[in-house]
Amino acid sequence: MKRTILLLSLLLAAAAYAQTPEPAVNYYAKDGTVSATDGTVYCVDGADSPTITICNAENRYSTVDASPSLYYKDGRRLETVEEYESVNGAVADQEAFTRIFRDMFTDEQIVALRNLRLPLAVGCTVDPETGVQLEVKFAIGNYPEMTSLPPDFYRTFEKRLKEEVRWNVNDFAKQLKYMFGLTVLNFRKLPLTSELHQIKPGLEEINQGEEVGLHH
């Protein structure tokens, strides 16, 4: 009888051990660099802080310690608040923008991210003439849901944003060498597969306020 009880206890302990999930891999656990499988190198900053910055090591303007200054094409720097407030623009095709986010995240990931505070912001450097995003920078919440996504994920994300997203900017911005854009994604407004029939109202909301716009 004692042997039976002991065997049962061992079996229960083994079952409990087998059911214990392994902790998610944190690819951004320390400052420095990480590499995607295609060789693209990303700089990581703020690994011990609530927000981690991930940016392509080849970025010139959208770096972890980049200057927020903007410059005219003739080399003069914008000096006044009025000048910076005159710079304006927005993502041209919200459907394309939202489609990328829908493709990059599964429904399960979206549901999990809806419960987190500011899990993802995307900064970019925009060519005012073409509206092309020249550079992309990610600011992720220091959550396992984000830090467990490998460098290849952010590489694919970056490539799609550069290839598929364009900005419309005002005439004042077209006088500049480059400008900065910022998207703070609200996952509660990103539709699940079952909610795709509501995508147009959601897109209108995504284009309001701080979620999509410029930053200086």
What function would you assign to each model-found segment?
Residues 1-2, 20:
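N-terminal hydrophobic targeting signals that begin at the initiator methionine
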Residues 3-14:
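Sec-dependent N-terminal signal peptides
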Residues 19-216:
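Charge-biased low-complexity segments
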